[in-house]
Amino acid sequence: MDRAKFIFVTGGVLSSLGKGISSSSIATLLQHCNYQVSILKIDPYINIDPGTMSPLEHGEVFVTSDGAETDLDIGHYERFLNRNLTRLNNFTTGQIFSSVIENERKGEYLGKTIQIVPHVTDEIKRRIKSAAKGLDFLIVEVGGTVGDMEGMFYLEAIRQLKLELGNEKVINVHVTLIPYIQTTNELKTKPTQHSVQELRRLGVTPQIILARSPKPLDKELKNKIALSCDVEQDSVIVATDTKSIYACPILFLQEGILTPIARRFNLNKLHPKMAAWNTLVEKIIAPKHKVKIGFVGKYLSLKESYKSLIEALIHAGAHLDTQVNIEWLDSENFNEKTDLEGVDAILVPGGFGERGIEGKICAIQRARLEKLPFLGICLGMQLAIVEFCRNVLGLKGANSTEFNQRCEYPVVYLIGDFMDQNHQKQVRTYNSPLGGTMRLGEYECEIMPNSLLEKAYKKPSIKERHRHRYEINPKYRQEWENKGLKVVGFGSNHLIEAIELEDHPFFVGVQFHPEFTSRLQSPNPIILDFIKSALSKS
């Protein structure tokens, strides 16, 4: 931790300004200067983690290799940095409070009255310092907006850290909005000025202003922001909208963000090597080919519920010089006659609950019968089994016990027991608590030779991430296999991890979530081959 330098990223004016992408972009530039870099996300909500939140409330829950259910921004960090992060890279107010109360019960505070300062702020600082071990830079993204009461003690902890570490170890980057008033054709700086005033009132002074704007800022406006916010003129970085989030590091580099960073930290001029990155971004922005993927989901009112999967399709497309167009198909209102017109492949993602499953099953049947390339992920694979049992084996009552515990043919059922990542036996019932009780994180999968899965991964054993309570019932396996639906992947305890359909160009189901390990620089192999198959269809 001694050598680590800290870049704190806060947000002002309103939420969803792109602090996560901004943090990822800064980290990417520093990483490409051969520094050891990581990112930490602080979430101010009181939930322990987002695991039980509705996807429509929070967006995607991203699962790390060590089984943590985290904020979707952790997915951005991994995809930009091309490395695995852990549960140490995300914490919530719920976790902070829980730790402080647990310590109080153990008597670790020696009878003191427990207060926000110093006990809560000390726990925040401890976690930040712990995440910085072995690094040159730790970027810390503070969720929420300056002025929110939920974030007050985080800003206090940042203020204290700057005093403890010194100015030469800390930079505060404030992401803010420069709104454009169309009627007067003006860009307005007043919200930024007020946001910075509020931040400074709380004891945190920004050294860099990252101004989100729909239009470029002229020199006069940048100078105005610099003067009113008390930063150097070259420390006002304009972040206009880009055609791809992966173009943001290039934009920040062109805007000169590394100049104030190097100056503050007493570093020589920074020269990131971005040629390979630039090539991939160019293929995203101006690809040679196109495919259309029918994406059959039910959380379509907030597409960030599927963020990692959307990005994984983009990664595969970049490596194939292909624009992947998504045809969003609502599984609750699925029209089998018209919804799949013109699609080159069908994707059925993971999900929870009974709502919309019949539409997904209908789409899977179309993919099977019409030999459209198909990829089913988690619930998507489970429903492929249900569809096959109903329509090929004639088991009309086939279902998952997630939807009907008394179904006639429980071809998908609750994982009663399994070995977790620590080789501890876990036992689950239908009455088990929901939070943190799924099969979570990275597990090994043995692949059958001569399968599409082996062709994609090019090795007999892989590790992929999981997030599920239900599994395929092996009782019916022989019946499926006799009809051409083969099991091609096995996990611990012989859990069925992957299936493929014979005499079909590409019909694959996987229990794991391949999207969680896809990165711009290294797309996930099975998703890459899925897009290849769609390309051959188009």
UniProtKB/Swiss-Prot annotation:
Residues that hold ATP according to the record: 16-21, 73
Keywords: ATP-binding, Glutamine amidotransferase, Ligase, Magnesium, Metal-binding, Nucleotide-binding, Pyrimidine biosynthesis
GO biological process: 'de novo' CTP biosynthetic process; CTP biosynthetic process; pyrimidine nucleobase biosynthetic process
The enzyme's E.C. designation: 6.3.4.2
Residues engaged in binding Mg(2+): 73, 141
Regulation acting on activity, per entry: Allosterically activated by GTP, when glutamine is the substrate; GTP has no effect on the reaction when ammonia is the substrate. The allosteric effector GTP functions by stabilizing the protein conformation that binds the tetrahedral intermediate(s) formed during glutamine hydrolysis. Inhibited by the product CTP, via allosteric rather than competitive inhibition.
Positions with a binding annotation for L-glutamine: 351, 379-382, 402, 469
HAMAP family xref list: PyrG
Subunit structure: Homotetramer.
Name of this protein: CTP synthase
Source species of the chain: Helicobacter pylori (strain ATCC 700392 / 26695)
Name of the gene this protein is made from: pyrG
